[in-house]
């Protein structure tokens, strides 16, 4: 399954919520005037009762799109989350949040996860002093992530840091923006993660 490269707001409208796919801190309804309409020429205002399966599938698609993960990757993350000790849904979110591209985004080096993923693929990011280009690397407690010396003057990184200052840096990450360097202190607790995600629906979907 190929990665989606079309209009970002269309995906957010499809899920009925802001997936944080576009840079900026404006509310979703300000980013797009069609916020409460499904995409398509004949998109109608949202309404009507959805089936249980439809709700579960939509939640999975929403989370998959938030983190920019393909279907097979997402399925593998779920299997790993179910294998280890703890609540499967919470484990799944921790695995997604621990991806290198997500951590780069959370540290404020990329204005979106897609931009953070591009920084990694272009070898503009170092992990514990070594340049890497695999966005899906699982970052561990104590790992140090930094912008490579050759990329520190990129305007998009400076712009991303300004946006991050408005958005806020999570407590489970420590960042020194003057050095363009940060430390992944620990995987986040569920209380640190987005409340609008209902991971129990995803667990119900995969449990069938």
Swiss-Prot record:
Subunit structure: Part of the 30S ribosomal subunit. Contacts protein S5. The interaction surface between S4 and S5 is involved in control of translational fidelity.
A Pfam short name: S4
Listed name of the protein: Small ribosomal subunit protein uS4
Stored InterPro entries: Ribosomal_uS4, Ribosomal_uS4_bac-type, Ribosomal_uS4_CS, Ribosomal_uS4_N, S4_RNA-bd, S4_RNA-bd_sf
Organism: Acinetobacter baumannii (strain ACICU)
NCBIfam families noted in UniProt: PRK05327.1 (NF003717), rpsD_bact (TIGR01017)
SMART domains reported in the protein's UniProt record: Ribosomal_S4, S4
Gene behind this protein: rpsD
Role this protein plays: One of the primary rRNA binding proteins, it binds directly to 16S rRNA where it nucleates assembly of the body of the 30S subunit.
């Amino acid at each position: 399954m190929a990665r989606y490269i079309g209009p970002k707001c269309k995906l957010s409208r499809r899920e009925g919520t802001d997936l944080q796919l576009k840079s900026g801190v404006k509310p979703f309804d300000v980013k797009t005037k069609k916020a409460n309409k499904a995409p398509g020429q004949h998109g109608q205002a949202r309404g009507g009762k959805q089936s249980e399966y439809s709700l579960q599938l939509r939640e999975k698609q929403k989370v998959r799109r938030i983190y920019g993960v393909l279907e097979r990757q997402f399925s593998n993350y779920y299997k790993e989350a179910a294998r280890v000790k703890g609540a499967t849904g919470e484990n799944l979110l921790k695995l997604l949040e621990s991806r290198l591209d997500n951590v780069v985004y959370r540290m404020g080096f990329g204005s979106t996860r897609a931009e953070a993923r591009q920084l990694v693929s272009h070898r503009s990011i170092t992990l514990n002093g070594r340049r890497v280009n695999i966005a899906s690397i699982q970052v561990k407690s104590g790992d140090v992530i930094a912008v490579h010396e050759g990329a520190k003057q990129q305007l998009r990184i400076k712009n991303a840091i300004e946006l991050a200052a408005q958005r806020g840096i999570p407590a489970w990450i420590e960042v020194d923006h003057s050095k363009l360097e940060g430390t992944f202190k620990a995987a986040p607790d569920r209380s640190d993660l987005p409340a609008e995600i209902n991971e129990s629906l995803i667990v119900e979907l995969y449990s069938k």
